[in-house]
């Protein structure tokens, strides 16, 4: 047998192993870069979505959806929206650094009048990478686009011929008639299409609202009169709604025992339907005596943290936003953008009220700020922030919720 020397091939295995290790390390490093870019892409899209929703909230807070032709409110919405976006960007970092706006937010009040849109583009440059630089020395950049809208059902039927229903939760059990006490009993909502009636002004009040009990005063409140006597010289009446106990309700520690009081204090998860021509709620004709006014007084005191309730300053409005100052909790003494004093109340069609059964048709919602409550008389002092109407021709599809709490939900829009 002939034996050949392989001395020239000695050490090649070590070289191959070394090259393999280097290749594996390079692939691992590239994988890290890919994950970094993928994570940054996800983070910037989340940041863009959050910023767009914050900007859309300005449409609600400014009142521009309730008065869609008011140029001053549109200007205010732009200013508030940009401020909200800049504030939230600092809290939504991409790769450890806040993203920046690419250009300026685009505010669209004309495509769907009364249901405005906002579009923003975010950018994050100079992302940290390692081995990926062998293909390009330029630091990678990620961008994201997000669009959101504030949906006020008042404008839906006028825009499209039918309205997309809303089904808000955490609605307080005070049914208010479609009569604006600040405009001599003119309607809040036009019945044919659910649009907000001309002449309504965002920020009306503060106005005292009265319970509809039989005359007598003090604790001698009997069954509510349906309809009540002529409206008082100032303010109007509210009616107690029938409520259903719900174990899922979110309640504060000060909650009471009755279902009616708890529905005032808690976030009541029983959703209200709105619109159409069929009765969908009822006035509670069984609440009597001192218990009724006690429930109202104690319920609202608990809800708004009396005597340390939040305050509303509308002196800058509409050139500047209404300012809410917290007077309790960790934010006490500071300006806040939300408050437990902001409530949603159902509006009913007083022209179709069934006086025998108390059945009513909810045709919209009021968003109001509660200032005070008088336990002896059942009076509640409120300022009106927004009005939402529902038409009589509901369209197909699921109700718009946007989180389920606000009567004017904000939501992301995807083309």
Where would I find each of the regions flagged by the language model?
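Alpha-helical assembly-interface signal, strongest on the long, hydrophobic N-terminal helix that forms
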Residues: 1-82
């Amino acid at each position: 047998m002939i034996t050949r020397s392989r001395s020239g091939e000695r050490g090649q295995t070590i070289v191959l192993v070394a090259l393999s290790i280097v290749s594996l390390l390079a692939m691992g490093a590239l994988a890290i870069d890919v994950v970094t870019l993928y994570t940054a892409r996800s983070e910037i899209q989340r940041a863009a979505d959050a910023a767009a929703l914050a900007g859309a909230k300005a449409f609600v807070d400014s009142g521009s959806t309730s008065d869609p032709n008011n140029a001053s409110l549109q200007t205010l919405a732009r200013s508030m929206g940009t401020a909200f976006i800049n504030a939230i960007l600092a809290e939504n970092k991409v790769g450890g650094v806040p993203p920046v706006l690419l250009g300026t937010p685009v505010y669209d009040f004309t495509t769907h009048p009364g249901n405005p849109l906002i579009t923003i583009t975010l950018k994050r440059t100079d992302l940290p990478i390692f081995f990926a630089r062998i293909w390009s020395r330029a630091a990678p950049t990620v961008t994201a686009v997000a669009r959101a809208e504030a949906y006020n059902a008042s404008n839906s039927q006028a825009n499209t011929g039918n309205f997309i229903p809303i089904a808000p939760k955490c609605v307080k059990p005070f049914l208010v008639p479609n009569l604006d006490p600040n405009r001599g009993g003119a309607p809040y909502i036009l019945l044919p299409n659910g649009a907000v009636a001309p002449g309504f002004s965002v920020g009306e009040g503060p106005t005292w609202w009265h319970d509809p009990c039989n005359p007598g005063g003090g604790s001698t409140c009997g069954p509510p009169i349906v309809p009540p006597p002529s409206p008082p010289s100032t303010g109007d009446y509210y009616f107690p709604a029938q409520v259903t106990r719900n174990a899922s309700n979110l309640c504060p520690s000060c909650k009471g025992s009755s279902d009616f009081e708890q529905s005032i204090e808690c976030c009541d998860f029983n959703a209200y339907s709105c619109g159409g021509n069929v009765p969908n709620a009822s006035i509670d004709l069984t609440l009597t005596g001192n218990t009724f006014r006690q429930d109202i007084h104690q319920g609202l005191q608990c809800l708004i943290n009396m005597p340390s309730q939040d305050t509303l300053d509308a002196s800058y409005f509409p050139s500047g936003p209404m300012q809410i100052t917290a007077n309790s909790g960790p934010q006490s003494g500071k300006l806040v953008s939300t408050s437990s004093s902001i409530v949603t109340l159902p509006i009913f069609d007083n022209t179709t009220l069934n006086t025998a059964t108390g059945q009513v048709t909810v045709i919209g919602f009021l968003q109001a700020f509660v200032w005070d409550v008088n336990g002896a008389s059942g009076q509640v002092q409120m300022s009106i922030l927004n009005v939402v109407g529902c038409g009589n021709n509901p369209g197909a599809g699921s109700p718009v919720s946007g989180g389920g709490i606000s009567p004017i939900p904000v939501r992301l829009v995807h083309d």
